């Protein structure tokens, strides 16, 4: 129930203390609204729509079944719901049908071969030239023209062609012995030489007069060393120093 709005006009009395006179001033009227109107704005947006769960939404499986086009998922243009070959409740080995699939040779024998190595005969040379087909002449009333291609005896039974293919001018026999009646002379091969063509002997025994190890006896060192120096050289290897300061 709506409550009526109450409009009140407030007045204020103001006294002028200085002059001792009083006067009345009127303010603007204020309109008050009820709490029902302030909080009921959302009721206007409500519409008469069904609540969730009052209608059924179709799933993607139900929508796929409504498609009039049959789904083809194999090579035989059959749908996914392919009926089984054998309807059985308990699939055991004895329920399988006994059959023998046809061999591929049997399938090939049923196919008709449409190929052959024999070709159509060549058209007659007389039909290759332009002539009047309306002429009806009896034999002896015309002169037969020579064939455009000379004919030769056919030597092959496979290719029924009498056209000369390879001229004999390229296969004229030459004078001389045949294959196997002569010896082939090979040219002499030269040995491998150096690129510098040097004739200096490389790996020859060197003629040196220096005797080898063991071919001579060592001489006693001169001047003779004192026993103290000789002992120091044996103990400290002083005689094998690179400087050889003891031998100088």
From Swiss-Prot:
Signal peptide limits: none
GO biological process, one term: pyrimidine-containing compound catabolic process
Matches recorded under InterPro entries: SHIPPO-rpt
Protein localization: Cytoplasm; Nucleus
Record key words, sorted: Chromatin regulator, Cytoplasm, Developmental protein, Nucleus
Pfam family, one: SHIPPO-rpt
Transmembrane feature ranges: none
A Gene Ontology term for the protein's cellular component: germinal vesicle
First-listed, main subcellular location of the protein, grouped into a coarse class: cytoplasm
GO terms, molecular function: chromatin binding; histone binding
Subunit architecture: Interacts with histone H3. Interacts with histone H4.
PANTHER family: PROTEIN STPG4
Function: Maternal factor that plays a role in epigenetic chromatin reprogramming during early development of the zygote. Involved in the regulation of gametic DNA demethylation by inducing the conversion of the modified genomic base 5-methylcytosine (5mC) into 5-hydroxymethylcytosine (5hmC).
Protein name from the UniProt record: Protein STPG4
Organism: Homo sapiens
Gene this chain is encoded by: STPG4
């Amino acid at each position: 129930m709506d409550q009526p709005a109450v409009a009140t006009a407030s007045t204020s009395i103001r006294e002028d203390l200085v002059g001792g006179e009083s006067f009345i001033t009127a303010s603007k009227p204020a309109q008050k609204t009820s709490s029902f109107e302030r909080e009921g704005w959302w009721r206007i947006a409500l519409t008469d729509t069904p609540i969730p769960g009052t209608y059924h939404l179709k799933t993607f499986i139900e929508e796929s079944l409504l498609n009039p086009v049959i789904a083809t998922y194999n090579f035989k243009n059959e749908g996914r719901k392919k009926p089984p070959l054998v309807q059985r409740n308990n699939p055991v080995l004895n329920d399988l049908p006994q059959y023998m699939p046809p061999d591929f040779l049997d399938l090939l024998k049923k196919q008709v071969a449409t190929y052959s190595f024999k070709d159509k005969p060549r058209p007659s040379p007389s039909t290759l030239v332009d002539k009047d087909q309306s002429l009806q002449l009896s034999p002896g009333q015309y002169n037969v023209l020579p064939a455009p291609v000379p004919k030769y005896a056919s030597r092959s039974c496979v290719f029924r062609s009498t056209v000369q293919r390879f001229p004999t001018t390229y296969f004229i026999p030459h004078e001389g012995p045949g294959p196997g009646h002569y010896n082939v002379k090979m040219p002499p091969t030269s040995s491998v030489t150096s690129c510098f063509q040097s004739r200096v002997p490389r790996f020859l025994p060197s003629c040196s007069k220096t005797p080898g190890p063991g071919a001579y006896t060592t001489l006693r060192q001169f001047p003779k060393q004192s026993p103290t120096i000789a002992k120091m050289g044996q103990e400290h290897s002083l005689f094998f120093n690179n400087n050889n300061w003891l031998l100088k």
